[in-house]
Amino acid sequence: MQEGVSIYLVSDSNVDTAENIASIAAAHFDTFIEKIKKYSYVGDINQIEDIVMEAANDSNSIIIHTMVVKELKEYLQKKAQKFGIKIVDVMGPVIDAIEDSTGISPHTELLRDSKEDYLKKIEVIEFAVKYDDGKDPMGILLADVVVIGVSRTSKTPLCMYLAHKYIKAANLPLVPEIDPPRELFEINPKKIFGLTIDPEVLVKIRKERLKSLGLNDNALYATEERVKKEIQYAEEVMQKLGCTVIDVTNKAVEETANIILNVLRGGEST
C-alpha cells in the first residue's frame, strides 16, 4: 500500500502562499495526503522546535515554508535536516534573486503589519459573530455599522463581508411583535443601514428556506400577508431612525456592502 504523506506548512507571515503552492503541486500526483498542518506567524525558535518534532514523529513528512526572517529560516532548515525531514523553501529563491539583482536586503516590517492586519480581521469577525441577530444590544453601541431588516435579507452574510473589510458590524432583526432595543435610537443614524426587499421576492426566499429545512412552505412566516406586514413595520422603524435604506432585491451581498462602504466614505447610497 502506498504510504501517505503529511505536509507541514510554515510561515512567519500568513501561510496562504505555502498552502496554495502545495495544493497546486499535490494536484499533479495521486498521492494520498494523510494530513496538512498549518503554522502561520511563526516567530521564535521554540515554535520551530515544536513543529519539527511533530513532523519528525510522522514517518513520511514534508515541510513547505515561506519563512523570510533569515535566522528563523536557517534554524528551521537545520532542524529539519537533522531529523531527515524533506523541506522546501518556496519563497527563498525568489527573494534571493531579487536581493542579488538589486543589492537590497528584504525587510521584515511587512510581517509585523501582516500579523496586525490578521489579528484585526479576526477581531472584527469575532465581533460579527458575537453580535449577530441581535444577540446582545451592547453590540449596537460598539459597532461601526448596524444592519437592520426583516428575516432573510442577508444581514448576517453582509456583516461577515464587512468584517473582512475590517468593519465591526452588528445586525438586528426587525419583527412587528418586538420593539427594537433602545440602544438603536441612541447611536448616530449614519451608522445604521436598513435593508428592505420586494415582498414577492422575499416570499420566494422564505419558502425555499422552509423547504431546505424540511418544513411546510405554507407556514405563516412565508405568506404574502405576513411578509408585507413585516416589511411595512421595518420601513416605519427605519423612517423613525432616519437611517440609510438599501433595497437589496436581487442584489448580491458584495453589491450591498459596496453601497455601505461608499456611504461610510461620504458618498451616496445610490
Curated annotation (Swiss-Prot):
Q: Which UniProt keywords apply?
A: Kinase, Nucleotide-binding, Serine/threonine-protein kinase, Transferase
Positions bound to ADP: G149, V150, S151, R152, T153, S154, K155, T156
Superkingdom per UniProt? Bacteria
Q: Which reaction does it catalyse?
A: N(tele)-phospho-L-histidyl/L-threonyl-[pyruvate, phosphate dikinase] + ADP = N(tele)-phospho-L-histidyl/O-phospho-L-threonyl-[pyruvate, phosphate dikinase] + AMP + H(+); N(tele)-phospho-L-histidyl/O-phospho-L-threonyl-[pyruvate, phosphate dikinase] + phosphate + H(+) = N(tele)-phospho-L-histidyl/L-threonyl-[pyruvate, phosphate dikinase] + diphosphate
Q: What is its EC number?
A: 2.7.11.32, 2.7.4.27
Show the InterPro entries listed in the entry: Kinase-pyrophosphorylase, PPDK_reg
Q: Where is the signal peptide?
A: none
One annotated GO molecular function is: ATP binding
Output the Pfam families linked to this UniProt entry: Kinase-PPPase (PF03618)
Q: Which HAMAP family match?
A: PDRP
Q: Which family does it belong to?
A: Belongs to the pyruvate, phosphate/water dikinase regulatory protein family. PDRP subfamily.
Biological role stated in the UniProt entry:
Bifunctional serine/threonine kinase and phosphorylase involved in the regulation of the pyruvate, phosphate dikinase (PPDK) by catalyzing its phosphorylation/dephosphorylation.
Name-wise, this protein is Putative pyruvate, phosphate dikinase regulatory protein
